[in-house]
Amino acid sequence: MTSSSSWVKTDGETPQDQVFINFRGVELRKNFVSHLEKGLKRKGINAFIDTDEEMGQELSVLLERIEGSRIALAIFSPRYTESKWCLKELAKMKERTEQKELVVIPIFYKVQPVTVKELKGDFGDKFRELVKSTDKKTKKEWKEALQYVPFLTGIVLDEKSDEDEVINIIIRKVKEILNRRSEGPPSKCSALPPQRHQKRHETFWGIELRIKQLEEKLRFGSDETTRTIGVVGMPGIGKTTLATMLYEKWNDRFLRHVLIRDIHEASEEDGLNYLATKFLQGLLKVENANIESVQAAHEAYKDQLLETKVLVILDNVSNKDQVDALLGERNWIKKGSKILITTSDKSLMIQSLVNDTYEVPPLSDKDAIKHFIRYAFDGNEGAAPGPGQGNFPKLSKDFVHYTKGNPLALQMLGKELLGKDESHWGLKLNALDQHHNSPPGQSICKMLQRVWEGSYKALSQKEKDALLDIACFRSQDENYVASLLDSDGPSNILEDLVNKFMINIYAGKVDMHDTLYMLSKELGREATATDRKGRHRLWHHHTIIAVLDKNKGGSNIRSIFLDLSDITRKWCFYRHAFAMMRDLRYLKIYSTHCPQECESDIKLNFPEGLLLPLNEVRYLHWLKFPLKEVPQDFNPGNLVDLKLPYSEIERVWEDNKDAPKLKWVNLNHSKKLNTLAGLGKAQNLQELNLEGCTALKEMHVDMENMKFLVFLNLRGCTSLKSLPEIQLISLKTLILSGCSKFKTFQVISDKLEALYLDGTAIKELPCDIGRLQRLVMLNMKGCKKLKRLPDSLGQLKALEELILSGCSKLNEFPETWGNMSRLEILLLDETAIKDMPKILSVRRLCLNKNEKISRLPDLLNKFSQLQWLHLKYCKNLTHVPQLPPNLQYLNVHGCSSLKTVAKPLVCSIPMKHVNSSFIFTNCNELEQAAKEEIVVYAERKCHLLASALKRCDESCVPEILFCTSFPGCEMPSWFSHDAIGSMVEFELPPHWNHNRLSGIALCVVVSFKNCKSHANLIVKFSCEQNNGEGSSSSITWKVGSLIEQDNQEETVESDHVFIGYTNCLDFIKLVKGQGGPKCAPTKASLEFSVRTGTGGEATLEVLKSGFSFVFEPEENRVPSPRNDDVKGKVKINKTPSANGCFKDQAKGNESPKGQWQTYIENSSTNIPSEAHSSQKTGFNGFNGMYSVCVLYEMYSH
């Protein structure tokens, strides 16, 4: 059949410069395609149109035309899938596109791209009807073509579109592609995005959520809102990937759109004018848009640009000038346009530049593992590490943790590890952890340098120096690091590096990403500079020893960090080993193995003395400094921090030297130090640590010049007797602990917040102590000569903690202190005070080992804030009055005269969830009525805890919520399951677990038989169940512990009862998830044992044991099992509880109205013969001395 196709050709064009148009003729030939053909002809573009589609044009001719074309326009319209011809052409176009011989531009004429790709609606129905008469192979080819071609960058023409404008856009795009193909490969800053058939940008897990968040900020749903969003984040975090994928998703919705990649590098290589030219060419699809003035160019094209909304992506912007060069004054941007700017410098995202900022977060652990596995196992999810695959799962997590969710770092590590065995993975991980100990050139960080190299190169030389210095002081306080860096003048260097994501500041600490830290240390080893100033940072001990031994140190060395734990022998150096290091700023000689370097030998020695003619040193830290003083030629003019712990110095330096920048001095345990005269001119000193300087007898009066001193530590200065009459106007913390000869204290600062006088020889406090209105903590523990406290101490309105433990001669506590409204902690153990102080604000009160107290105040229940009350070994205490409602901890262990307790024991029990522990162990004079009251309280507490837990989130941690203990040998009557001995076995009816179990009350009676021990009392719990099919499942966990350390060994003289309540949430979850027969009874057992603090079995006998299930309140409870449903061999315990609130299961009687509504199950029990597992559950009740353990088993018939 002859062809009647129409051709348009202009002189000078080759037949290859042609466009093939694929369309549905009966629908578009006489309107849209006709207008498009004329437009192409006017621009001199060859176009091929099959004018005889309905007549059956020879297919081979059409396919030849496609093969001879450079561009194909695939125009999808509502009736497109009626034509086999259209689909055959489309399949050929797909083939040529995959061969990269053809560029296809999809045009969606009154259909949406998703309709075409997913064959929706009438469009899809027509296709399915058409392919009924075709073979499977052809159907597959056509369907793949329909799914493939619409995925390319296309143009949408809907009912509201201006047809002429769309045709002009098509023509401009065709011309631009033809020009680009004739010029060869595009430059890296090409304004046009890569075609979709080319390799797609690397993506990562979790990007869909980030795209959604970014879309919300851009407000794509609002046609009238112009939004400019800045995308920021550290290098490698995925900014470019995110921007590219968003562009690919949305560009076909905009008639004008452009993405400019790597603007920083492009502007460096080609200049801003060239960049602006490419930008306008991409946006306007015009040739030779010469840019001499950026603003003039925008004005020249303003009317044309304002015709339609634009989508603009500016990737990797490094300064504002780049944005201004491309966007100008922005008066050419139509409402509804969307602009995205990605950068690694947060400081660029000022309000005038963007509407909002999106900081790309790191990958979650889950997504990071998936991303890492993609590269470490070459995308083979089946090869991903899992159970039974050696140590790969753990190693994978370690690598992910190291990268902290950085996608590019994960990708590079994964590629490095691809195909390697487990031992190689281990070596690589160890290299990452130990990189600073490896010799230069052997570090793995070369592989990761690509993540940061672009951002690092963009830094100024000052910023690079600062970054490499910060790596030396990682995780240090922000103010400290800023002082070291800025000692030569004011600077915002830290803020600048934070904005560029090179460092971060969290909780006041300066830190950086692990991969950058590793790179920084490597660069510090290799760094050089043209000005020949110090740039080298030495870390490896071999290198440092060689430099010192051979006197190779020069002005190129900036810092030395020598770890003495790496050195195995003593070294002797010449006196001028450091003399040539004129630009040395940081010198640290330390030990990671032991901060005190306990070895008696000094490893670095200078037998001829030492020259330190250094002027630039900011930081001098020398553990076990071997000389009597810092050399006279050392200039501390720039010194910020001086640390000489465990040194041989007798004085800091000769005479007073100007040290205007010195803020921190630490000379701790320099036992020969006898004077501080040399520090008289360190007027900006903030902290002075002289702990353990045992030869120091006095402090100089010129310390008063230290106007900024806030911290002074004199702990263990055993020769110090007093302080001079000075005023340190800024001092907040003064430590005189262990100054055993210190007899007289006087106030040297009105701003003190913490004062430590413990272990001193003072007899009294000065009357003007009331001046310390900011004092929060006063510690006078072990001041054995202290006899009285001044009334003025009661004027300390800010005091929160007062420690008087061990002040054995102190027998009075001033009554005038009742108005100390902020005092929370009051420790009076081992004093001679006769009456408990009446300070209602106290939360923790300790009166342990006080033999003068016989009674507590009757108004103790008014101490509403009191939570911890310690009364151990108060041997004359006879009565415990009613306790306050919020008390969580009461310990009267060893109160040998205690006989009675108040009834009720607690004035009211709060309905909120409050853990509590009441310990009455070794109170052998306790009367029976007191024991019964303790039991009644325990029962009520279990009720209220069950009710409170109903209102709690089930995510709370399984734990012991209540425990108590007292001398006795009888099991309380309200425990429904009990037995003689250590094991209780029982059988529960089918569906028993539908009773909304809330917890378990536990009880055990233990015989101690004069046992001595320091063991801890803890409870663990274990459960095992059978699923009815021959297999079983189990859980094991530590329910909780209330452990108190006590170093006093004593004899326990009687049997004791322990009662506890646990929520055992994991057990409840297991019960609810049983997979066994639905109507089978459940057998279970509990086994109690006593363990020592080391976990071993104690030689103690469990006399009796028991428990009760505690269910949720009555109104929410499913009917519980009756007594006759519970099988057992032990007598049924039907003794009613003290308040008569329990339901008799056999008779089904309800609880009396108005009584406690929580239900404690009352049933018979079964004595077991054996146990199948050894899991422990526990509760504390015996002064932290023994471990009572419970073994729980459950299985189904």
From Swiss-Prot:
Changes seen on gene knockout: Shade avoidance phenotype in the absence of shade and enhanced growth of the bacterial pathogen P.syringae pv. tomato DC3000 (avirulent avrRpt2 strain). The constitutive shade avoidance phenotype can be rescued by RPS4, a TIR-NBS-LRR protein that confers resistance against bacterium Pseudomonas syringae.
Chain coiled-coil ranges: none
Tagged with keyword ATP-binding: yes
Boundaries of every TIR domain copy: 15-178
Pfam entry (one): C-JID
Keyword Acetylation: no
Reaction it catalyzes: NAD(+) + H2O = ADP-D-ribose + nicotinamide + H(+)
SUPFAM superfamilies: L domain-like, P-loop containing nucleoside triphosphate hydrolases, Toll/Interleukin receptor TIR domain
Protein's name in the database: Disease resistance-like protein CSA1
Active site: 89
E.C. number(s) listed in UniProt: 3.2.2.6
A molecular-function term among this protein's GO annotations: ATP binding
Organism for this UniProt entry: Arabidopsis thaliana
Matches recorded under SMART domains: TIR
Domain NB-ARC span(s) in chain numbering: 210-480
Cross-referenced InterPro entries: C-JID (IPR045344), Disease_R_plants (IPR044974), Leu-rich_rpt_3 (IPR011713), LRR_dom_sf (IPR032675), LRR_R13L4/SHOC2-like (IPR055414), NB-ARC (IPR002182), P-loop_NTPase (IPR027417), TIR_dom (IPR000157)
Record function comment: TIR-NB-LRR receptor-like protein that functions in photomorphogenic development. May function downstream of phytochrome B (phyB) signaling.
GO biological process: defense response to bacterium; response to light stimulus; response to red light; signal transduction
Domain remark from Swiss-Prot or TrEMBL: The TIR domain mediates NAD(+) hydrolase (NADase) activity. Self-association of TIR domains is required for NADase activity.
Positions annotated as LRR repeat: 614-636, 638-659, 694-716, 728-749, 750-774, 776-796, 797-819, 820-843, 845-862, 863-889
Keywords: ATP-binding, Developmental protein, Hydrolase, Leucine-rich repeat, NAD, Nucleotide-binding, Plant defense, Repeat
